[in-house]
Amino acid sequence: MNDEQAIALALAEAQQAGGRGEVPVGAVLLSAAGEVLARDGNRILEKKDPTAHAEMLVIRAAAAALANERLTGATLYVSLEPCAMCAGAIAMARVSRVVFAAEDPKGGAILHGPRFFEQPTCHHRPEIARAGDAAAAGNVLKEFFRARRS
């Protein structure tokens, strides 16, 4: 599976999350061999858990499935730039690569805000890449919040 196909799966998860009333963010975690280890969307409201971001859920699911807290070689695909909490989990899990579609100037921690992986205290720095239609990914979020305001 290539980056565009995997990010499309993450966007589908984001749309499903939005359909459940969650902020529409989706994530997919692939093994080094390109197999889907886990895929999910935000479930913060459903689980009554502020840490139930899509990235956290797929990291937890993959670690449990593999019976290993290290996800070395794995690539995380996310519809939106990960926040600081998720960046910390990415580093702790040793995810090798992170690919996201839309930037998050307000809450992102990769290209914006704390730039988590650029900090001298960060012990693991995954490769960062972009894929997918950033405008389309951003529009999913914009439409979700527009509908909530009306």
Predicted stretch roles:
Residues 37-44:
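Short beta->alpha transition motifs characteristic of CBS
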